[in-house]
Amino acid sequence: AKEAAAPTTLKGDQVLKDIFYEVKNKLETAIGV
């Protein structure tokens, strides 16, 4: 059923992932991991 989801939902998930990784990278850089 998830495969039949609207393209906008898929795009939204991708945007959230991009934001998540961007924030994660900034945090790791700030912490010095």
Curated annotation (Swiss-Prot):
GO terms for biological process: pollen development; proton transmembrane transport. It comes from Solanum tuberosum (Potato). InterPro entries: MGP1. It holds the Pfam family Mt_ATP_synt. Mitochondrial membrane ATP synthase (F(1)F(0) ATP synthase or Complex V) produces ATP from ADP in the presence of a proton gradient across the membrane which is generated by electron transport complexes of the respiratory chain. F-type ATPases consist of two structural domains, F(1) - containing the extramembraneous catalytic core and F(0) - containing the membrane proton channel, linked together by a central stalk and a peripheral stalk. During catalysis, ATP synthesis in the catalytic domain of F(1) is coupled via a rotary mechanism of the central stalk subunits to proton translocation. Keywords: CF(0), Hydrogen ion transport, Ion transport, Membrane, Mitochondrion, Mitochondrion inner membrane, Transport. The keyword Lyase does not apply. This is ATP synthase 27 kDa subunit, mitochondrial. The keyword Lyase does not apply. One of its GO terms (cellular component) is mitochondrial inner membrane. It comes from the Eukaryota. It is found in: Mitochondrion; Mitochondrion inner membrane.
